[in-house]
Amino acid sequence: MRKYQQGVGLLEAILASAVLGMALVAAGSYYKREAELMIKSSNAFDVIELSSQIQRYASLSKINNRTNPILKDNKAKEFKDADLKWLKLENCLTAGDVPTTGNNNDLQDQFIACDADYRKGDLSYFGSQFEFSTYVHPSNPEIQRQIKQVVSYFQYRGMERAFIGDAAGYVISEAKKKGFSAQDYRIVLIEPDRVGYFESNVISYEEFIENPSARENFLLKATKDRTLALAVSLAQTGEIAMQRDGSVAFLEDTELCWDTAAGSAKSCLSVRYDTVGNKTELDLKQIDVVSAKGLSFESDGKTKTPVVSTYETFQDGGRAKTINAIECPTGLNNRFAAVVSSFSTAGQNANFSSESAKDSQGTTQKDGSKGPHALLSGISLNWTLTNKVWDVTASIGIESGILPTSGIDSGSLLRNPKSLSFIAFQWCEN
């Protein structure tokens, strides 16, 4: 009677293990697909990060909203200093230090201090303009649009007058004339006194960031105490999809901007304009613009950045998996989560056709010979953050000593096995 009861228990355990195996396979396929989809959300983060790069070098000086059409007609309060401060780096100059635009090994940001003015002028970020084209991803049909072009707008202030124009078409045409790739970042100066006219000065994004003297010459040579706008343009091609928060795919008619105060989507700002006589009017419906508040979103009362996900596998046999932490804006902390993607204990030649055939050349037999099949009893993932690196460890419980005649069940614990894969999710949160 005891043997019969034990046999039934084994059969039930084997069936349960088979069901668990199918569930793990299904879960692995699901999470891998989700990871592929969510990885595309990093494109949104990359585009926003490129915009914030220049903002880090900008001062927080207030712009004259009386002469600037964007601030005049589109709620200047959305560009308050407090809303922009989190774009600054944490390791700022201390009080009394003199800001410099030269190389400084003590600063990650070698161009300007957190609260210091740009040495020879002010550069302020307004927003990023996104133009989309219809696109259906072959593997993820729910994604129905891709970025066609991004133009980020900044203002260099030399005097009272200010003007922001649409430089998207000009940037592409000029890039082609000069033999530049349409995918390169271009920075263009816009003449404030002549609508539709653009300065011929064009500098690459890389040169603007990496060459302080070239950047200063670019700003000073063309401006000569005039106030000009900067348009930083990036043309995106290929399988690129935009997602707002790393989990909701953008459909073609989905609004881009997120109102953190209201906790809902809202109409975006625009830099498209019409000039009638001496009056400049902005069309708020033509093009999406992410304002300073659009760089993060509100969820459950917390401010978060878009989620970045990667597909990871333990490779070093028994060692923890290390993953570099993403950079977070000032005031936001790193967050991490991991979900098991796939794991198999069956090995090859597993046979579950009957209660008596429960053998496999699996993980319990080092020499590859037949033996008792390892039954999975549990998986756990743990992670810690040390020096901007996530250390992920895994523990797998295996009932390795089940024998129908001995009545002995000696379990074992497997740590960080090579066969275990998981999806890692990272984001920043206050």
Curated annotation (Swiss-Prot):
Annotated region (Disordered), positions in chain: 351-371
Task of the protein: Involved in TCP pilus biogenesis.
Naturally occurring in which organism (per UniProt): Vibrio cholerae serotype O1 (strain ATCC 39315 / El Tor Inaba N16961)
Effect of residue 202 to A: In strain: Z17561
Protein name as catalogued: Toxin coregulated pilus biosynthesis protein B
Residue spans of biased composition, Polar residues class: 351-366
Result when mutating residue 254 to S: In strain: Z17561
